[in-house]
Each structure stands twice: as structure tokens, then as C-alpha cells.
Amino acid sequence: MPIVSESELVAAITRDRAAKKRIALAAACFDVLGMDDVRALQTARAQADRLVVAVLDDGAVRARLGEGRPVVKLEDRAEIVDAVRGVDYVIVCARADVDRLASLLAPDVRA
């Protein structure tokens, strides 16, 4: 599935909830995606029917990891995460928006 907007994500999750699907939400920088990241996403997906992944924007990555980061540009990080088996939806957001997104989606699992 391509990277989605917030409105597209909310609509999709609303349909998934109507179909009684369990939702997991994971959020991270994913700058230089490693096997630990992939395993964490797989673990989250194993606990739910749908996995939403929030890829943090460049400002959030820089604030968390320091100057010179991110190494991988945002669009590539989002596309790489989208390619991980089991990821259903990818959204890009600022760190401050993750809690608001969680309120909107009310995930059953937060990873």
C-alpha cells in the first residue's frame, strides 16, 4: 500500500474497525532500517490484523539523533518501511503528532 495521508488512514482504519480488525501502531525514525526494526514491526503485526507505521519526519529524527541525521531521506525511509512484509499502512508525521494519531486511531497495540 502506498504512503497514506491522515484522512486516508482514518478512513481505512474506520473500515478495518467495522470489520472487527485489531490495529497496531508503531512509530519510529527508521533512519537506517535494521533487523531490530524489522523484528519489532513483525512482533507488532503478529498481535494485530493491521499494522500502521508512522515514520517520523526529518525534524523529529534530527531532534532525536542529532545533526547530520537523517542519513536516509524521508521519502526513502517511508518507502523502505512500506516494503516490509506485514506493514499495511505507512504515514509520515512529526513526533508531536504521534500521540494525536494514536488518539484518532485508538490502536489495540502500540509498539
List each language-model region with its residue ranges:
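Nucleotidyltransferase catalytic core that binds NTPs
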Residues: 1-111
